[in-house]
Amino acid sequence: MTLRIIAHLLALTASLAGCTSTAPIYVEQPTPIFVRQESTVLKLESFHASEQQRLLAFLWKASRGRRDALHLVISGSSRLSAEAVHQARQMGIGASNIHLLDQNDRGHLRIEAVVYHALPPICRSLSSQLLNDEFFDQPIGCSTSHNLAVMINDPRDLLGNRFVKPSDGDRAAIPVTTYRTSTGKGGL
């Protein structure tokens, strides 16, 4: 009887020892996504029909069909800038992507078209011919970063959030304060 209990205890100990591993866990650092900026410049002296066609061709070529990811920096003549902004808005470029700088009454106009490109990280393959210990510890984060870099609409968003302003939480505390003081609707 005791021999059977000892055999069961040894089997239980061996199975529990296999579940607990003292080997260090190596966590691979996340692979960064690199964002590259590409700029092209167009200078216009007037806004005749030929210049307007040059502007439209320039915007189409610079955007590569992705007008929502094209950022324009327009400087120079305020009258020509207004015409260029109007043409860009008609092409579908968002107002938040058009920036006016150094407006004056001089004769020429400078339009800089900026496009951002995300360069996805190079990940090792999850399928391997050799089944070693690292095969089961492949980093999932690298493939997630790769997919994000490939699918993101405007890679400039990876550089930082320019729409949400940082705050100290005072606005978020207003509903809690209202609830605690019972001055809101349904207060007792």
Swiss-Prot record:
Residues 1-18 form the signal peptide. Keywords: Cell membrane, Lipoprotein, Membrane, Palmitate, Plasmid, Signal. It is found in: Cell membrane. A lipid is attached at residue 19 (S-diacylglycerol cysteine). GO terms for cellular component: plasma membrane. It is a lipid-anchor. Its main location: membrane. It holds the Pfam family Pilus_CpaD. InterPro entries: Pilus_biogenesis_CpaD-related, Pilus_CpaD. The keyword Isomerase does not apply. A lipid is attached at residue 19 (N-palmitoyl cysteine). It comes from the Bacteria. NCBIfam families: pilus_cpaD. This is Uncharacterized lipoprotein y4xK.
